[in-house]
Amino acid sequence: MANLERTFIAIKPDGVQRGLVGEIIKRFEQKGFRLVAMKFLRASEEHLKQHYIDLKDRPFFPGLVKYMNSGPVVAMVWEGLNVVKTGRVMLGETNPADSKPGTIRGDFCIQVGRNIIHGSDSVESAEKEIGLWFKPEELIDYKSCAHDWVYE
């Protein structure tokens, strides 16, 4: 079997406030991915600026940081085969108007500025984001009893 990879998923303040945390976790679990780490926190502006550093020159950057700092987020690390790519498909397009029904954004979002969830866009950015949000000892290594029922 190919190597399992990890991705960073964050439920944004609007997803938390709308009570969608359980539904989002459920979808990742039902897909067969394994939760490796999770924390509930209100990220500082400095932390968010570091997370979104690649967007710092975009006109929407200050509003994005303010929005992400407006309430608590749920930061998670998920593990599985092709979890980065599959996770992005599960999330839907960044703009919910372009997202298909059945995706998280297609089912729960209307506007791009309130798209409820973030997911790493590559294995490299996942590694960077996981390192920014979690200490190594916060990543829990265990074998799920469902592993052999999900993977050949």
Swiss-Prot record:
GO terms for molecular function: ATP binding; DNA binding; enzyme binding; fatty acid binding; G-quadruplex DNA binding; GDP binding; heterocyclic compound binding; identical protein binding. Keywords: ATP-binding, Cell projection, Cytoplasm, DNA-binding, Kinase, Magnesium, Metal-binding, Nucleotide metabolism, Nucleotide-binding, Nucleus, Transcription, Transcription regulation, Transferase. PROSITE patterns: NDPK, NDPK_LIKE. It comes from the Eukaryota. Its cofactor is Mg(2+). Its main location: cytoplasm. Its EC number is 2.7.4.6, 2.7.13.3. GO terms for cellular component: cell periphery; cytoplasm; intermediate filament; lamellipodium; mitochondrial membrane; nucleus; perinuclear region of cytoplasm; ruffle. Major role in the synthesis of nucleoside triphosphates other than ATP. The ATP gamma phosphate is transferred to the NDP beta phosphate via a ping-pong mechanism, using a phosphorylated active-site intermediate. Negatively regulates Rho activity by interacting with AKAP13/LBC. Acts as a transcriptional activator of the MYC gene; binds DNA non-specifically. Binds to both single-stranded guanine- and cytosine-rich strands within the nuclease hypersensitive element (NHE) III(1) region of the MYC gene promoter. Does not bind to duplex NHE III(1). Belongs to the NDK family. Hexamer of two different chains: A and B (A6, A5B, A4B2, A3B3, A2B4, AB5, B6). Interacts with CAPN8. Interacts with AKAP13. Interacts with ITGB1BP1 (via C-terminal domain region). Interacts with BCL2L10. HAMAP family: NDP_kinase (MF_00451). This is Nucleoside diphosphate kinase B. The lineage of its organism: Eukaryota, Metazoa, Chordata, Craniata, Vertebrata. The gene is Nme2.
